[in-house]
UniProtKB/Swiss-Prot annotation:
PROSITE patterns given in the database record: EGF_1 (PS00022), EGF_2 (PS01186), EGF_LAM_1 (PS01248), EGF_LAM_2 (PS50027), LAMININ_NTER (PS51117)
Record's subcellular location: Secreted, Extracellular space, Extracellular matrix, Basement membrane
GO biological process: brown fat cell differentiation; cell adhesion; endodermal cell differentiation; epidermis development
Name the record gives this protein: Laminin subunit beta-3
Organism of origin: Homo sapiens
Residue ranges annotated for the Laminin EGF-like domain, each copy included: 250-315, 316-378, 379-430, 431-480, 481-533, 534-580
UniProt keywords, alphabetically: Amelogenesis imperfecta, Basement membrane, Cell adhesion, Coiled coil, Disease variant, Disulfide bond, Epidermolysis bullosa, Extracellular matrix, Glycoprotein, Laminin EGF-like domain, Repeat, Secreted, Signal
Region (Domain II): 579-785
Signal peptide: 1-17
Subunit structure: Laminin is a complex glycoprotein, consisting of three different polypeptide chains (alpha, beta, gamma), which are bound to each other by disulfide bonds into a cross-shaped molecule comprising one long and three short arms with globules at each end. Beta-3 is a subunit of laminin-5 (laminin-332 or epiligrin/kalinin/nicein). Interacts with ECM1.
Major localization class: secreted
Glycosylation site residues: N220, N604, N810
Amino acid sequence: MRPFFLLCFALPGLLHAQQACSRGACYPPVGDLLVGRTRFLRASSTCGLTKPETYCTQYGEWQMKCCKCDSRQPHNYYSHRVENVASSSGPMRWWQSQNDVNPVSLQLDLDRRFQLQEVMMEFQGPMPAGMLIERSSDFGKTWRVYQYLAADCTSTFPRVRQGRPQSWQDVRCQSLPQRPNARLNGGKVQLNLMDLVSGIPATQSQKIQEVGEITNLRVNFTRLAPVPQRGYHPPSAYYAVSQLRLQGSCFCHGHADRCAPKPGASAGPSTAVQVHDVCVCQHNTAGPNCERCAPFYNNRPWRPAEGQDAHECQRCDCNGHSETCHFDPAVFAASQGAYGGVCDNCRDHTEGKNCERCQLHYFRNRRPGASIQETCISCECDPDGAVPGAPCDPVTGQCVCKEHVQGERCDLCKPGFTGLTYANPQGCHRCDCNILGSRRDMPCDEESGRCLCLPNVVGPKCDQCAPYHWKLASGQGCEPCACDPHNSLSPQCNQFTGQCPCREGFGGLMCSAAAIRQCPDRTYGDVATGCRACDCDFRGTEGPGCDKASGRCLCRPGLTGPRCDQCQRGYCNRYPVCVACHPCFQTYDADLREQALRFGRLRNATASLWSGPGLEDRGLASRILDAKSKIEQIRAVLSSPAVTEQEVAQVASAILSLRRTLQGLQLDLPLEEETLSLPRDLESLDRSFNGLLTMYQRKREQFEKISSADPSGAFRMLSTAYEQSAQAAQQVSDSSRLLDQLRDSRREAERLVRQAGGGGGTGSPKLVALRLEMSSLPDLTPTFNKLCGNSRQMACTPISCPGELCPQDNGTACGSRCRGVLPRAGGAFLMAGQVAEQLRGFNAQLQRTRQMIRAAEESASQIQSSAQRLETQVSASRSQMEEDVRRTRLLIQQVRDFLTDPDTDAATIQEVSEAVLALWLPTDSATVLQKMNEIQAIAARLPNVDLVLSQTKQDIARARRLQAEAEEARSRAHAVEGQVEDVVGNLRQGTVALQEAQDTMQGTSRSLRLIQDRVAEVQQVLRPAEKLVTSMTKQLGDFWTRMEELRHQARQQGAEAVQAQQLAEGASEQALSAQEGFERIKQKYAELKDRLGQSSMLGEQGARIQSVKTEAEELFGETMEMMDRMKDMELELLRGSQAIMLRSADLTGLEKRVEQIRDHINGRVLYYATCK
């Protein structure tokens, strides 16, 4: 309840401080920096450190008094060590230097940075004639003077000006305050830093930053105060400071409103401080002095808070992919002060200053609802079609494809290409299909490379019309011959001209009309005189080929030339396929023709103009006059004195260049055409460069693979490459032989054709007879049926074989009911591809399974390592716990010995008592009762032997856990016992302290009677009386301090007695409850024992049950021991409470007697108590 009320009181202050920090700079409250830090204070000279020393001071007008300084012991009454200047040292304590030592310094060396606000010094003796205060903010490396102080600045510091400083480097001298008797009775010096720099134009925050930060402070006494001499013995010259206050706080750069203890700081009374060391930082700052931005708040540079501007550190923007960042000044300057944080250790495959882009070979995940861990996914480029080593687009994921490859993953060949392989630098190779007979959008299948023919076009390359069709050159497929069935010799027409073979007396393309006596197609002239062959390329002609009269070739649209073998202007591609160019070419060509016409007209007009007797064109004359005026203007500009020679030369050079350009202007169409071809040349060069780059990367990868592999693998690779090269060479040689054979066959066929055409009557009957024989034999229908797998009924001979041979569209697969060699071969090929794909999938699945097995092995190894590490930690923790118990018992014994030592004073007893009572015990008897209930619950679950046998393992584990918890409760009970023993020791020590107080009072009474008898002697002999009075004063001060401490201790012990009585009553009630619980446990245990006795032959299970029983008996014994100890503790508390009440009654009477003695002594020794 008490912490709740403290929180309620502190909460408004905390909220107010946070609001103050939210409005701008904020600073912690000030306190005395010296309290609790006297160990950091040192003096260059201290009296009585090695041996006692005597110093004399002026007393009254003509007298002097001399006192002793003995600083060998820190708490001696005559000790004047430097730690006495702290405000916590109490009255009648001061620091004093040795006599006649000059200069002397007091220096404070702190271990952290603090903010100093004010320095206050009170002097015990004469004020110094000259001194200076300086500070260091880098732990003593460099020093800067705050201010010079002197009784006479002109003589003490002649080179230092007086007044207020006007800049940070301006240091002035301030006169010391002059008061009556200041040289004899001391004085006070106060230095406020804000008042010191009040004349400097700067904000409050800037002043604190500039002069408030300290790590070291030094006060240098440079000149002793002049003391006038009285009689033959001069007074002693020394420096003495009774109190030094350093008001300040922890130094937080305006980013904190309170301070906290540093980690691991001791909380003892001797080290209690008013000002803690570490700042509780605000504004997203961190560090002991808030000197840097907190982690992940580095988006702007750190700056001290100033006035209303907190200069709050801003959080870095890493898009959720990092928790660490750093500040980069270059980035901050490039963003013009907008941001400067650079993220570190980007996760999820991201990179960049803000983890805003994907890493190389990763791209942005565009799937809706993707988690932040799936922001970037790996590129899915096909290694066969993508450029090796080239990353995909980080936004779209588009891979960089080879020249003849397309698709987002580079897994498809472009139209007209097939055979995607990794070894091909261009990815795919061009289909070997006839451009006239194949489809325009997709000439071939991209996987198999099979040509896709137009309607009625056949052949592996789509280069032949189907039987009874012609006109392959149309590009739309072949058309039926449509020969007249009565007038033609055969339904098959010429594939190129469509001319049907007509019967005698009939003519025309389809033999549909009677023959006209004129030269046949592709000839011209007169039939009577003889027909001559047309000199034309019939692939580019139409109709009869040429004019029957003149022989001029009749070109198809888009073709030109004497033989119709050239593409007409406006048509592109190569002959015989001439297609209309892009519409932009027509526009460009029209513009060129218009410009050519205009140029011709201009040339004709100019020639007629200069050939006449004079210039008749008035417009031309006006233009010439205009040119002359411009030339005059140019001359005027050139003659202007404001123009330099360099500018004139530049203008002249420009005019000369323009004149040359005008003179060289002419219509240069070839240059324009060359310019238009430059983009194509650049594209060709780019493709060549990409091919070379791909080849280089492939060779490099092969080299790296070979260099990283073993020599046997490299040898196998070389052998494979050699075999592939040999096979390729063999194929080339076979192709060469096949081409030679085809060439010979073609020549032989041409020779036979010529012979047949020019043989006259001898050859014709033989050819007719051969044709008649081949029209019936051999019959190829069974062969084609076996080959194609169909049931053809029509006869097929070498002369006539109508219809399609294989109606399955160029030999495609026909499914599971295939018959014939060709369909089954196609089906087998497809099945082989499917099996290969299944094998690749099976291989990938094997790889994934292998990875899963490896991951499982690694997980098992990690679990085993974790178990071993946990076992080691448990063993170490047990050893550490046993060592802590041993050290705790040793400490309790040491404290007990220290408190029972008769030489220990009451103040030390009080400090130890406070420290012991301040300890917080984490447990009480309620914990013991809880463990009893758990043991009882276990006993309740044990009566059924069959259930015990089935759950032996779980019960053993649960028993071991409860055993550990019981051991922990036992340790806590020992701690409670130690606390009670400490309380008893405190009571005994209180008794000893009371006895010492009675002895001291008796000694004081004897000293008082001695003083009353020797008053006359004291007036005659001064020095012995002074020594005696000094001794009595010291004893009186010690006695009064001890009595105050004993009074406080008595009150506290009374309250503790009441609390102990309440605790004893509660412990008694819990003990009774625990006793009842143990009675129930005894009953359950007896029943369990009976059942276990009945099942003595249970083998291994019985042994386990016996082990559980033994552990339960041990727990029961330990619990009974704890109950006995609790009873003993209750008795000790009762006896201690009674002893405290008796001692309190005795202290009441002694307090009155002490007050009477104090008043009497103060009245008698008032004259002698003058040594301050």
